[in-house]
């Protein structure tokens, strides 16, 4: 039966020990494993004893990795499991580590959801749908997601969302209805709900300077006209130019007037 002949502190990690059986290095263990099994020099160990020691120390390795991983920021169960799997910790050990983390409140999904909610509302321009999506991706329970997504809706101020929308609006150019449409699409992409978006848009003023709009119309007209001038006959070219400008949100009468002003059309052309 193998006998412990030496237990020494590891040089690179003072919290772990090298265990020698019959003068041969057997394995490394941490102090908790050493104490739990009351290991000491001269002690004889059966194969079953060694199996238990190895199993427990593997769990301890996983636990220490999890604690270190959790020390940087809050994590969900899913995140911890994925991390330990990458670290090649066994499924049995992972299960025991997760149980410990819940017991010691190292993993707390309600606390996680609350913290993420506060951070996102305070530091991002994202709406409740993005928050909800993040919680799903992180493996949070559906009932917790439902509760905290509703809190997100309640606590995100409408004035703050209006500021987000106005910031978006400043980056968009073109006719009023098109800018409004672009702002709406951006807010949808940022995770805001239609009821909120409509409330925000109703509070905004999309009126633009007529001179600026006229310059934009002239620029877009020239761009579309020159792009297509070699592809179509004059009548078809005018029709395509009108269609392209209307897709950009310009009004038909404004387009016709600009075409006449530019000498491209005489006012009799219609969309084919």
UniProtKB/Swiss-Prot annotation:
Chief location bin: cytoplasm
UniProtKB keywords: Cytoplasm
One family name in Pfam for this protein: RecX_HTH3
Gene Ontology cellular-component annotations: cytoplasm
Cysteine disulfide partners in this protein: none
Cellular compartment(s): Cytoplasm
GO biological process terms, semicolon-separated: regulation of DNA repair
Keyword Disulfide bond applies: no
Lineage top rank: taxon: Bacteria
NCBIfam families assigned to the protein according to its UniProt record, in alphabetical order: PRK14135.1
Family the UniProt entry places it in: Belongs to the RecX family.
Protein purpose: Modulates RecA activity.
Protein name listed in UniProt: Regulatory protein RecX
């Amino acid at each position: 039966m193998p006998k412990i002949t030496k237990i020494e502190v590891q040089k690179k990690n003072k919290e772990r020990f090298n265990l020698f059986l019959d003068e041969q290095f057997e394995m490394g263990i941490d102090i908790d494993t050493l104490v739990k099994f009351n290991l000491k020099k001269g002690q004889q160990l059966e194969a079953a004893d060694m199996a238990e020691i190895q199993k427990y120390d593997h769990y301890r390795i996983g636990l220490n990795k999890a604690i270190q991983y959790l020390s940087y920021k809050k994590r969900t169960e899913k995140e911890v499991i994925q991390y330990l799997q990458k670290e090649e910790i066994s499924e049995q050990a992972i299960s025991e580590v997760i149980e410990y983390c819940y017991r010691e409140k190292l993993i707390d999904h309600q606390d996680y959801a609350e913290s993420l909610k506060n951070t996102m509302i305070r530091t991002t321009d994202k709406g409740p749908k993005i928050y909800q999506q993040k919680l799903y991706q992180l493996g949070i329970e559906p009932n917790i997601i439902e509760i905290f997504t509703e809190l997100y809706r309640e606590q995100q101020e409408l004035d703050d969302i209006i500021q987000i929308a106005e910031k978006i609006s400043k980056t968009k150019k073109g006719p009023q209805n098109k800018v409004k449409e672009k702002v709406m699409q951006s807010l949808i992409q940022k995770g805001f709900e239609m009821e909120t978006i409509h409330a925000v848009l109703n509070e905004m003023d999309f009126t633009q300077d007529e001179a600026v709009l006229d310059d934009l119309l002239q620029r877009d007209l020239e761009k579309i006209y020159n792009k297509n001038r070699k592809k179509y006959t004059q009548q078809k070219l005018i029709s395509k130019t009108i269609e392209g400008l209307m897709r950009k949100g310009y009004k038909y009468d404004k387009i016709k007037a600009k075409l006449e002003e530019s000498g491209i059309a005489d006012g009799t052309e219609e969309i084919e």
